[in-house]
Regions:
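Active-site neighborhoods of divalent-metal-dependent phosphate/nucleic-acid chemistry enzymes
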Residues: 169-179
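Anion (oxyanion) recognition and catalysis
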Residues: 17, 70, 189
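Short beta-strand-to-loop acidic/aromatic patch adjacent to the donor-nucleotide binding site
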Residues: 48-60
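Short active-site alpha-helical segment characteristic of glycosyltransferases
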Residues: 180, 184-187
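N-proximal low-complexity "stem/linker" segments adjacent to membrane-targeting elements
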Residues: 1-31, 35
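Active-site nucleotide-sugar/metal-binding loop of Leloir-type enzymes
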Residues: 38-51
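Short, intrinsically disordered, charge-balanced linker/junction segments flanking boundaries
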Residues: 191-193
Length: 193
């Protein structure tokens, strides 16, 4: 984790606490970001939290960015950030339905088709709808593996057996590869979320 990311998280936790919003911090170790995101989502679904905030290890942000994400009461809100390529170019990984007709919504929001999960706020209802519409995404593990993963996410019950779904996965369709975050956006959009 970059120092700037850790400072962003600490400042955000402080701002949330001062606003009376309870927040919890959860991280996992995994060489696969898809597996890590699915594990974290599983732990979130077992919790009594309403929202999950995804934060990549190299993203810097202000507490105000997160507070603004909570205001509009949308199911999914992301704060796009520059693509980590050429520092002299400004490029964002967002997809608009019609880039020539971008409508500014209340709270200075815009609707996008796809966006990055590096700073994405997701309401629990999103995953509940995805579970209902896509039971085939359920991941099964041997008991010994489930026990290990439950410990990793601090689950007191069998969260892995109940909530481990493949929400976050890369896709390859029509010769186009998408990372797990853009594929998640597409999955949610297909489910009318």
């Amino acid at each position: 984790v970059r120092v700037e990311t850790m400072i962003s998280l600490l400042d955000t936790f402080s701002a949330l606490g001062k606003s009376g919003i309870e927040a919890r911090f959860q991280t996992v170790k995994s060489s696969l970001v898809t597996h890590a995101r699915n594990l974290l989502t599983c732990g979130f679904l077992q919790s009594d939290c309403d929202h999950m905030l995804c934060v990549d290890a190299d993203v810097q942000f202000t507490p105000e960015a997160v507070m603004r994400m909570l205001v509009p009461k949308e199911f999914i809100v992301c704060t796009p950030y520059r693509v980590k390529e050429d520092p002299l170019k400004t490029k964002y990984t967002v997809k608009f339905k019609d880039p020539d007709k971008i409508k500014i919504l209340p709270w200075d929001m815009v609707e996008i088709e796809e966006g990055p999960a590096g700073l994405m706020l997701i309401h629990k209802i999103v995953f509940e709808k995805l579970i209902d519409k896509h039971p085939e995404l359920k991941i099964e593990f041997k008991d010994s593996v489930k026990e290990k993963m439950n410990k990793e996410i601090g689950a007191t019950e069998d969260a892995i057996g109940q909530y481990m779904y493949n929400f976050w996965d890369t896709t390859f369709n029509d010769h186009e590869w998408k990372g797990e975050d853009l594929a998640f956006s597409e999955l949610a959009r297909r489910c009318s979320i």
